[in-house]
A protein has these predicted regions:
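N-terminal "leader" segments that precede or initiate the main folded domain
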Residues: 1-114, 195, 218-257, 399-436, ...
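Hydrophobic alpha-helical transmembrane segments
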Residues: 3-10, 14-22, 45-49, 107-119, 163-177, 180-185, 201-209, 335, ...
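Hydrophobic, membrane-inserted alpha-helices
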Residues: 10-13, 175-178, 197-203, 221-225, ...
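Membrane-interfacial loop-to-transmembrane alpha-helix junctions, especially the N-terminal start
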Residues: 23-36, 189-195, 372-386
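Membrane-embedded catalytic interface detector for glycan/lipid assembly enzymes
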Residues: 84-233, 248-263, 327
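Small-residue-enriched transmembrane helix-hairpin modules in multi-pass membrane proteins
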Residues: 137-162, 251-366
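Hydrophobic alpha-helical segments
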Residues: 337-343, 347-437
Length: 470
């Protein structure tokens, strides 16, 4: 089955040489292609050739990814042809300026609200899984982090964790990033110290529930932001972000959450294996199990998606598919095993629907890549919003339509829109200031009225005060 990966990989290489290398892998289209290749490779490694259902699943996934790449490539060529045929000047992907957003009262108010919401949530729950795990490790009595984590999200008491996550995992760290960039570029010592403290609070909030997915996604968002801030170039110093920040936090969480308990591996190796499993194994195992589970069920015609979207509403548990699949794998409902993106599409709209949606995704993500970041200037708030949208859509490997919403798509879109409104206001003020400086100065009302004085204007396109003569 692994040979099925090679033609898709070859098509992806062609797509990279023609299109992706122009705008970079850290774009909605580029990141989606990379993640889907990882998903396909990891899945094909697990497929049992003797199972017709699993073989069909592998073929279905390979065909869907190939259709996506083909549609994306055709869309890219169409956009380039349209630009070449038009009289408009060609726009490059890196011809823009970046301005920094300062800590306005509105931004600071949203930061405070995010901190209050996060603190109120953990106060209501009564504990932080991360802090309890750290306390247990220090005391020599490791806590049952899996149970604590599950109780905080799906216990008897419901404290709207999905809504809290929008503040805790998206808005707070994103605004902290904006303020850190401003303080180290324009601010003084006090501003830098305050931004570092805010960053520490944001990182603790990301890790507090004992789930590292949000941390990994935001570190990737920081990488995309750095790439865009430097006009689609990734400085070598930016590569230190995963090493200097990501690796220590992954090691700490591995130690605190006791993921390597009973293992003779070093914490570094355990963290690396855990990260490898997250991208190459875990989602693939879950997706394969979900497809085996749903293959004998009738097509839902979008019903399971509607259940999942209804789960966004307060108090609604949403779709139970992931919990049902988890039960078939582990004999317990105290966890979730979501289907893959393509498995979810097939379960909801069958094979023909999957073909259409795969092609549609290729068109939409390519247009998102092409039609954004083409203005003359952007600000840091816009960039962090677009970076988050890029990561949320680009890493969409598992789950249905509710998955991007749960991991912050709407919140990042809101930050993007907020930043664009800020830029529009700045451009309006800039044009108004320019118009005022070009307006002729009025003649003084007292000119020629004071006895013994006369006003002698000079001949120029702008009236100026002349010389006073007795």
């Amino acid at each position: 089955m692994i040979l099925l990966f090679l033609p898709v990989l070859g098509l992806a290489v062609v797509h990279y040489l023609v299109a992706i290398r122009r705008y970079g892998i850290l774009s909605p289209d580029g990141l989606f292609v990379v993640c889907q290749l990882l998903m396909l490779y990891g899945t094909l490694r697990l497929i049992n050739p003797a199972s017709d259902t699993e073989v069909f699943y592998g073929q279905l996934m390979a065909a869907a990814i190939a259709l996506y790449i083909g549609a994306s490539l055709v869309t890219y060529l169409w956009v380039k042809h349209s630009e070449a045929a038009s009289a408009k000047p060609r726009v490059t992907y890196s011809a823009y300026r970046v301005s920094l957003v300062r800590p306005t009262p509105t931004i600071l108010a949203v930061v405070v609200i995010s901190i209050v919401v996060t603190a109120a949530y953990f106060t209501a729950v009564g504990y932080s899984a991360f802090i309890e795990g750290l306390r247990g490790q220090l005391n020599g009595l490791p806590a049952d982090i899996a149970t604590l984590r599950l109780e905080s999200y799906a216990g008897n008491a419901y404290f709207f964790p999905g809504y809290v996550n929008q503040f805790k995992n998206v808005i707070l760290p994103s605004l902290a990033l904006v303020l850190v960039v401003w303080s180290f570029s324009r601010g003084g010592l006090l501003a830098r110290v305050a931004s570092i403290a805010l960053s520490a609070v944001a990182l603790l909030a990301l890790m507090a529930t004992g789930q590292r997915g949000a941390l990994v996604l935001f570190l990737l968002t920081v990488m995309v932001y750095t790439f865009l801030h430097n006009r689609r170039r990734l400085p070598r110093a930016a590569l230190l972000v995963p090493v200097v920040i990501g690796l220590p936090l992954m090691l700490l969480s591995t130690y605190v959450l006791a993921r390597s308990a009973g293992s003779t591996e070093s914490p570094i190796r355990a963290a690396m294996n855990d990260l490898f499993a997250r991208f190459i194994n875990d989602n693939q195992v879950s997706g394969l199990a979900a497809f085996n589970y749903t293959s004998g069920s009738p097509v839902r015609n979008g019903g399971e998606w509607l259940d999942g979207l209804a789960g966004v509403l307060p108090g609604n548990r949403g779709s139970t598919l992931s919990a049902e699949v988890f039960y078939t794998m582990y004999g317990s409902t105290r966890g979730t095993s979501p289907p893959s993106l393509w498995g979810s599409i097939h379960y909801n709209v069958d094979t023909m629907g999957l073909i259409l949606i795969a092609a549609l995704l290729g068109v939409l993500l390519q247009l998102l890549t092409q039609r954004t970041m083409r203005a003359a200037s952007y600000n840091s708030l816009e960039l962090v919003g677009f970076s988050g949208v890029t990561v949320v859509l680009g890493t969409w490997m598992a789950g249905g339509l509710e998955t991007p919403l749960n991991v912050g798509l709407v919140a990042y879109l809101g930050l993007w829109y907020w930043g664009s409104r800020t830029s529009s206001g700045q451009r309006h003020l800039s044009r108004r200031s320019t118009a005022l400086t070009r307006r002729p100065l009025p003649r003084p009302a007292f000119a020629g009225m004071v006895t013994g004085l006369a006003y002698a204007p000079r001949h120029s396109s702008r009236l100026r005060y002349g010389t006073w003569r007795p």
